[in-house]
């Protein structure tokens, strides 16, 4: 995970959404680092549990796994699943990302969540994190490094891997842009904003 990707694909959309919302800055600014920490602690687990669950469901042999970084040992971004694999076990985290994006868009557009902390968590974990996850891993593949999309390419072909990577990336990207456009005065209407104002 790179700092620049996290800043551009995760934190920046969150800040923009909050700024366009009906909430005053004092209601959400202190929540941003809390949301980031919760995301950071859950990111590797959600990614690796998808690999592991797919391997177990398909009866693949699992040799070793680590679902979260060992923070107490100073590890900041280590997680892995070593197992027999196929196309589904390799792609499962990104299938999860696509599903999460659809769920996130539905929750936010229907205004099911109206509290800034829960809204921020839903946006970050369900929409912005999938954007980061797919973009980060696909771009690593494009630079010829070994990762999930490289394994998927070896199992299929380079053309198929690029098609899947771009197609999967498009969904959380479009979801993010759509929600940022819909963020104006969220979750309340213009009249509430005019009545109470923003500071």
Predicted features and spans:
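Metalloprotease/metallohydrolase-associated module, dominated by Zn2+-dependent proteases
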Residues: 2-19, 74-197
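Cytosolic juxtamembrane regulatory segments of multi-pass membrane proteins
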Residues: 47, 198-199
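Auxiliary, metal-adjacent structural segments of Zn-dependent hydrolase domains
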Residues: 1-29, 34-41
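Small-residue-rich helix-interface/hinge motifs
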Residues: 36-86
